[in-house]
Amino acid sequence: MIKSFYIHNFKSIKNLTVDLAYNAEKAPNGYKKSDSHIFFQTGSKKSDRVVPVFAVYGANCSGKSTVLLAMSVLNKFAKGWGPVVLFKPNKLSNLSKEDDRTTFALEFYCNKKLYAITLTYNAKSILHEELKVDGEVLYCVDHSKITCLNESLSKFADDFSEILKENCVIAMNSHQVNMFLPIIRKFYPGISKDLVAVHNYLQNDIIILSEDQSLDEPLSYIECFNLLSKTYKGERANTAKKQALSDLVLTMNGLDFDISNLSITNSGIKTTHKSSEGKEVEFDFKNESEGARSLIQKLMLIMYALRVGKTIMIDDLDKSLHPLVACELVRMFKSKRLNPNNSQLICNLYNTEPLSEVLSSSETGVLSYSKKEGSVLTRVSQIKDLKSSDDLRYRYARGDFGGIPFPYI
């Protein structure tokens, strides 16, 4: 589960932190008996509480998609991509040459430990890479040299330095072009449970569905469906797929989408509707509404995340969807019944209905943009004059929190 994500000098962002820590002074009365997740308790301390949902509001071009893209870039580094194609600095800010670098710092909980991975890079090289576990440094690479290893890894210092030199650093200019983490995982796959946990988390435990396709093609419907069907363990492949389809249709019906059956194969998607006479009529998927097509893809990934406890980040969650449907998608992550594995949702929204229906101030951020400050994220719970009785939807629409456009023609 993500606790925070810090971004420096990336596209429209100069400095921004997405903070998912539950920051109310105390938990509400009766929260343990509530049907809804108020927070996830990831450790014994109050500081180990994180929210199940974080929704970001903001005007067009304020940088909402940039946050998801930044996470995609960190994911790409973990998969072996280099800095040349991943360096996307803020071109509108007056940053000094020394500050012409991007930094990502991700804090997340895994196996009841708090991990913090920090990566700084420019167009030519990875400048700094560091991994901490519960506040202690596991390893640190700075300007192409290993500067710190914890006690259990220090015995491999010479081997690690040689691996770094041979597999991550260009000899002629000493530029580090590959992240150290996946290389160590490759050469020493079982050397540290913490290294394995972090690498697996960065590669597999964060699902990103973004409108920005500059780095990746979006997941196809069949890829989304295969992810979902594989969560039905202990079943034969065909039986698992049938059960996944059945649950998908049932959930869509619960969201008031009138589809009686679905067929998802490599050759395409077919939907079935019942006629006025009760007969089943098959349709090609392209004939469905944009809302239905959008929902099916999102819903497959949401159901997958809920079944296995992943974190999912969705750009424009409410795109082409009725506000009440968008509310229910958010509510799925707050439901203890539907989300028993502590899955997290981070999403961008335009529709304000969830502010009245399902989102708390701790679960809401507002993004504003200016050329001087770049994209600035304000967490609603940190606004000084906010009262617990305030209507968040009304106050946001009125402009009290910023993050709204001021159109005039």
Regions found by a protein language model. Give the residues of each.
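Switch/communication elements of ASCE P-loop NTPase nucleotide-binding domains
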Residues: 1-78, 271-404
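Short flexible/disordered coil segments
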Residues: 147-169, 230-231, 240, 320-332, ...
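Amphipathic, soluble alpha/beta structural segments
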Residues: 158-191, 325-326, 332-337, 341-344, ...
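Acidic, Mg2+-coordinating catalytic modules of nucleic-acid enzymes
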Residues: 243-263, 383-409
